[in-house]
């Protein structure tokens, strides 16, 4: 399986503990493409369609029509994890550079790499 940074797949994130995002849901691959090429794992961020959640600076909204989603959704950059690529199933879409710039900014905030 060839996985690229910016790809969105369905993945089964179960089992979970506490407030972790779980179940079969879309995830965004945020790992660099060298890691994606050589590692059996991928670093991903969970995506939810629960857009009424509190808007955090670590959230990036996805327009369903523009990116081929069934519903408007939110990328949760505070919900990142490393998963085996075997958890990835169907590819949904690939996010463009404009969207990935927003993801990068939210990720930097999540990891305290920039002041907020």
Curated annotation (Swiss-Prot):
Cite the EC number: 3.1.27.-
Function, as annotated: Toxic component of a type II toxin-antitoxin (TA) system. Specific for 5'-UACAU-3' sequences, cleaving after the first U. Yields cleavage products with 3' phosphate and 5' hydroxyl groups. Cannot digest substrate with a UUdUACAUAA cleavage site. Overexpression is toxic for cell growth (shown in E.coli), probably by inhibiting protein synthesis through the cleavage of single-stranded RNA. The toxicity is reversed by the antitoxin EndoAI. Toxin activity cannot be inhibited by MazE from E.coli. The EndoA-EndoAI complex does not seem to bind its own promoter.
Q: Which residues form the signal peptide?
A: none
| Assembly | Homodimer. Forms a complex with antitoxin EndoAI in which the toxin activity is inhibited. One dimer binds a ssRNA substrate, forms a heterohexamer composed of alternating toxin and antitoxin homodimers which inhibits the endoribonuclease activity. Antitoxin prevents RNA binding to the endoribonuclease.
Q: What else is known?
A: Replacing all Arg residues by canavanine yields an enzyme that recognizes a longer consensus sequence UACAUA, thus altering its substrate specificity. Still cleaves between the first and second nucleotides.
Alphabetical UniProt keywords: Endonuclease, Hydrolase, Nuclease, RNA-binding, Toxin-antitoxin system
Name the InterPro entries on file.
PemK-like, Plasmid_toxin/cell-grow_inhib
What changing residue 21 to A does, per the record, is:
Not toxic in E.coli
Q: Is Manganese among the key words of this record?
A: no
UniProt record, GO biological process: mRNA catabolic process; rRNA catabolic process
- Its name, as the record gives it, is Endoribonuclease EndoA
Family from the record: Belongs to the PemK/MazF family.
Q: Where is this site: Transition state stabilizer?
A: 25
- Pfam families assigned: PemK_toxin
- GO terms, molecular function: DNA binding; RNA binding; RNA endonuclease activity
Outcome (variant: residue 10 to A): Remains toxic in E.coli
| Organism domain of life | Bacteria
């Amino acid at each position: 399986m060839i996985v690229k940074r910016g790809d969105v797949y369905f993945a089964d994130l179960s089992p979970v503990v506490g407030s972790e995002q779980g179940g079969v849901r879309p995830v965004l691959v945020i790992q660099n493409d060298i890691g994606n090429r050589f590692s059996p794992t991928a670093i991903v961020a969970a995506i939810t369609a629960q857009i009424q959640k509190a808007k955090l600076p670590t959230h990036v909204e996805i327009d369903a029509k523009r990116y081929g989603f069934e519903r408007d959704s939110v990328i949760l950059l505070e919900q990142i994890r490393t998963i085996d690529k075997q958890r990835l199933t169907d590819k949904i879409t690939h996010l463009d550079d404009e969207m990935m710039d927003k993801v990068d900014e939210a990720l930097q905030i999540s990891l305290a790499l920039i002041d907020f």
